[in-house]
Amino acid sequence: MKILISTDAWHPQVNGVVRTLTSLARSASALEADIAFLTPDGFPSMALPTYPGLRIALPNRREIARRIEAAAPDAIHIATEGPVGWAVRAYCRRRKLAFTTSYTTRFPEYIEVRTRLPASVGYAVLRHFHAASSMVMVATDSLRQELGARGFRKLGFWTRGVDTDLFNPNNPVTLDLPLQIFMTMGRVAVEKK
């Protein structure tokens, strides 16, 4: 099966979406899937307002169509709700093609913190975006429940996991410390809670 995954988040960005999709690409052969990515590469871009270090693509409708048709996918998954995601969604809707989507980033809260636009507006936009999807993939049951309470439908799981090549009991990290330490790491940004 040939799967086309569109994403607005791609290298050189370092975030959960990019890491998940990169890991998926490495695992594709084990999954017996041929995965192609439609990324922001090659499109003009602009700095994201309030976050100048992050650029967003400005995709051309014809180029989106050309890339999708060149990939000739059996299935289309839209991983992000940015301009590339909206353009792929529009392509699929015009041609009455089924597609799935992912909900990974709390954009309504992100936008509210950075612009003061109420999160309720962002959720209305994202409900509209995902309503056309055959299934909205979420990583956790708590997110599924939260989105369900906010009116999102057709919610399914695409769980993550632990990279067992990096983290496994056969390769323990040994530190000479007087007690056990538990640590979590994540990106620090104003919108992160």
Go through each PLM region and give its residues.
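Active-site proximal beta-strand in glycosyltransferases
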Residues: 3, 75, 90-110, 137
